[in-house]
Amino acid sequence: MSKPIQMERGVKYRDADKMALIPVKTIVTEREELLRKPEWMKIKLPADSSKIQGIKAAMRKNGLHSVCEEASCPNLAECFNHGTATFMILGAICTRRCPFCDVAHGRPNAPDPQEPIKLAQTIKDMGLRYVVITSVDRDDLRDGGAQHFADCITAIREKNPNIRIETLVPDFRGRMDKALEILTDTPPDVFNHNLENVPRVYRQVRPGANYQWSLTLLERFKQAHPNIPTKSGLMVGLGETNEEIIDVMRDLRKHGVTMLTLGQYLQPSRHHLPVQRYVSPDEFEYMKEQALAMGFTHAACGPFVRSSYHADLQAQGIEVK
């Protein structure tokens, strides 16, 4: 029996090292290794990379992180080239070790108390009107990081009075009451928390998370702030069926969620969960039709859709694929 990895604080554990820490092991079969991307999954990179480098430089200068880079998002080039980014607060090391995610796992450092101020100034310098703030899971903090979210929201609004803020929050496992209480006086303009996939595959896809807990978090925020949209998203292609996806959509509506994102899961490395299937654009369009029929005010469904992909357009109800 091999010895467990002794994690050092502040060290990023990725790929094989990260997967070795997950109780439910990822086993890649020969068939899954041979699964190739269809034509609709090909991305054309922009010719001009000046804006991309500019955003990266601004992040580095202020010691900030983007989920676009840390999670290896396939839309990074497009979003950065349009001058948009999703900021990831509370560091770049997650206390969870989900096998679909490319964000590093480990023992994170203490939150940077200057991060809210640096974040607010960077957003002002970039001239953003809509911003998405997300974070790693911080199970090491007594409030799960909720106060840091609130501090960031306050600082951003002080320097950017006309901005709209969307938060993509973790599940605040075991800390929901405290987190929601903290956010009572400083709520975002859109409250987003992803279910990620269907409950049948949760043990493998989201170890440490609970499907009903996440639904309850969304519902309780909506009950406390009925005029603020709630939003959630799923990745598809991890072994779920279309019928199961539709069932999850129904659960979201029952819990008051009005905005939905569905996108194709892509394997970050050979050490991560393999893609079980590529969902066609026609299937995504069908899912969107079903979502709107259920009463979602907006549904962004497509191969490259992610939670924060053109989030400003999503919030305006403009079609995103």
UniProtKB/Swiss-Prot annotation:
<comment type="similarity">
    <text>Belongs to the radical SAM superfamily. Lipoyl synthase family.</text>
</comment>
<dbReference type="GO" id="GO:0016992">
    <property type="term" value="F:lipoate synthase activity"/>
</dbReference>
<keyword id="KW-0963">Cytoplasm</keyword>
<feature type="binding site">
    <location>
        <position position="98"/>
    </location>
    <ligand>
        <name>[4Fe-4S] cluster 2</name>
    </ligand>
</feature>
<feature type="domain" description="Radical SAM core">
    <location>
        <begin position="80"/>
        <end position="297"/>
    </location>
</feature>
<feature type="binding site">
    <location>
        <position position="73"/>
    </location>
    <ligand>
        <name>[4Fe-4S] cluster 1</name>
    </ligand>
</feature>
<protein>
    <recommendedName>
        <fullName>Lipoyl synthase</fullName>
        <ecNumber>2.8.1.8</ecNumber>
    </recommendedName>
</protein>
<dbReference type="InterPro" id="IPR031691">
    <property type="entry name" value="LIAS_N"/>
</dbReference>
<dbReference type="InterPro" id="IPR003698">
    <property type="entry name" value="Lipoyl_synth"/>
</dbReference>
<keyword id="KW-0004">4Fe-4S</keyword>
<feature type="binding site">
    <location>
        <position position="68"/>
    </location>
    <ligand>
        <name>[4Fe-4S] cluster 1</name>
    </ligand>
</feature>
<dbReference type="Pfam" id="PF04055">
    <property type="entry name" value="Radical_SAM"/>
</dbReference>
<keyword id="KW-0411">Iron-sulfur</keyword>
<feature type="binding site">
    <location>
        <position position="79"/>
    </location>
    <ligand>
        <name>[4Fe-4S] cluster 1</name>
    </ligand>
</feature>
<dbReference type="GO" id="GO:0051539">
    <property type="term" value="F:4 iron, 4 sulfur cluster binding"/>
</dbReference>
<keyword id="KW-0949">S-adenosyl-L-methionine</keyword>
<dbReference type="InterPro" id="IPR006638">
    <property type="entry name" value="Elp3/MiaA/NifB-like_rSAM"/>
</dbReference>
<dbReference type="Pfam" id="PF16881">
    <property type="entry name" value="LIAS_N"/>
</dbReference>
<dbReference type="InterPro" id="IPR007197">
    <property type="entry name" value="rSAM"/>
</dbReference>
<keyword id="KW-0479">Metal-binding</keyword>
<feature type="binding site">
    <location>
        <position position="101"/>
    </location>
    <ligand>
        <name>[4Fe-4S] cluster 2</name>
    </ligand>
</feature>
<keyword id="KW-0808">Transferase</keyword>
<dbReference type="GO" id="GO:0046872">
    <property type="term" value="F:metal ion binding"/>
</dbReference>
<feature type="binding site">
    <location>
        <position position="94"/>
    </location>
    <ligand>
        <name>[4Fe-4S] cluster 2</name>
    </ligand>
</feature>
<dbReference type="InterPro" id="IPR013785">
    <property type="entry name" value="Aldolase_TIM"/>
</dbReference>
<feature type="binding site">
    <location>
        <position position="308"/>
    </location>
    <ligand>
        <name>[4Fe-4S] cluster 1</name>
    </ligand>
</feature>
<dbReference type="GO" id="GO:0005737">
    <property type="term" value="C:cytoplasm"/>
</dbReference>
<comment type="pathway">
    <text>Protein modification; protein lipoylation via endogenous pathway; protein N(6)-(lipoyl)lysine from octanoyl-[acyl-carrier-protein]: step 2/2.</text>
</comment>
<keyword id="KW-0408">Iron</keyword>
